[in-house]
Amino acid sequence: IMPQNITAEDNSVNYDNLIIVSDDIVSEDGSNVVRWTKDKTYVICSKNMVNRPTVKCKLIIEPGTTILFGTGTGNIDGIENSEVVYRPYPIFIVEEDGSIEAKGTKEKPITFKNIDTHVGWNGIEIFLPDNGEVTDTFEYCNFINGGAQYRDFTEGLIDVSYGTEETKFNLVVDHCNFDSTELVKNVDLQTSEIGAGVYYGDYDGNKVEANIKISNSTFKSLSMGIEGVTSDD
């Protein structure tokens, strides 16, 4: 598969009906907002085994949009060789200056899942800033076959960590479905080997002001639905 063109607005390469996202997601117009639309399917990829995309602005995902991931090895077709440039990546990283607003609807949910040629993926990893307020929202979203540990380690399909006592973090998860049944079956894993649905870790005892609201959501074939870890050290 050869790239047809570069879409500067999305920092990605366009393969027919797939948008291969391999560079940082940043706003080109100064608005600090990038929108992903349902008429495209986005594949999170590493480039040449080195670069992988990170969210560095507010990413708004439109209802009905699909975002695909992979194991980090093999191309879009799942075949690995030395000539592969773009490999579906298992982790979607949200940096300190980024956030995600994924508001689907009952009729048009947003889907985060593995591309069919890869058995699974890890999760969305959110790093909190040292100060200021940040909000991440997931409504009517499907998280399918995540929670594996490919290329790197994540604790959950939504994995939040760091921040300080000067950080205010808001997380809304509503009417979301977390289901890794096919991953557990196809890779012969125990559910204890899969990450949590939503994980929050304050490892350094930073006492982040966290407002986390999880409602009307289901969790299936995961080590646990919701997990939180704090430290006073």
Question: What are the residue ranges of the model-derived segments?
Answer:
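Beta-strand/loop edge motif enriched in small/polar residues
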Residues: 2-233
